[in-house]
Swiss-Prot record:
Alphabetic keyword roster: ATP synthesis, Cell inner membrane, Cell membrane, CF(0), Hydrogen ion transport, Ion transport, Membrane, Transmembrane, Transmembrane helix, Transport
GO CC entries: plasma membrane; proton-transporting ATP synthase complex
Organism of provenance: Parvibaculum lavamentivorans (strain DS-1 / DSM 13023 / NCIMB 13966)
Listed name of the protein: ATP synthase subunit a
Pfam families for this protein: ATP-synt_A
Domain of life: Bacteria
Bilayer disposition of the protein: Multi-pass membrane protein
Function: Key component of the proton channel; it plays a direct role in the translocation of protons across the membrane.
Compartmental location: Cell inner membrane
Amino acid sequence: MATGAEQTGGGFPVDPLHQFVVQPLIPLNIGGLDASFTNASLWMVVTVVAIGLFMTLGMRSGAMVPGRMQSVVESFYTFIANMVRDNAGHDAMRFFPFIFSLFMFIFFANMIGMFPYAFTVTSHIVVTFALAIVVFLGVTLTGFVLHGPRFLKVFVPSGVPMALLPLVVAIEIISYFSRPISHSVRLFANMLAGHIMLKVFAGFVLTFMTMGVVGWAGMILPLFMIVALTALEFLVAALQAYVFTILTCMYLHDALHPGH
């Protein structure tokens, strides 16, 4: 989210990329490895704490007739539980705690990143790729543990003519191992692009403000665009958490039911 007017060398009042700079807050070097506690680390901790507070405050009463806060928490639970059942099957509910945690982390990280001076951790490919590779390795390991070598049937779609089978298998293998890339880039690129657009239009507003009366009239359009884009970004933040999670459910379905 736009965090102020950082002057760039080219004269544009706002640097759209400044908001993504990872800065060490507590420098730490272990055996030549930079393990500093950064602003990204801080906002990941804030995200986890916010989720913990949200769940604790929402469910502390445990009333049979839920209040507003408890209803919100239960709606998250129901929504994600239905997502798992519909896309991965009822037997996938054993993995519900992981999928629920994954959705909540991405959702809260995206939403927190929309506020001024916050850091959007999901706008960094290293974070989204770490999440995607955990999903990929977990799904693959689950497939082999449950099915052994039969899990390899995931690369052999049913009903494919023998003449096309080698080509189709090759395509399926490439597609499978590219999952972490597409899974992570989708989230990273959407969050990055949206925040850059917000910062660019904020720069236009600041530029027009320095032009006197004419500039104040000219800033109406970019100011309107900021409001519209902010609303759109909140929608995208929620949607990307949903997309990342539903893809995880679909990948899990492949592990539980290979060859289907």
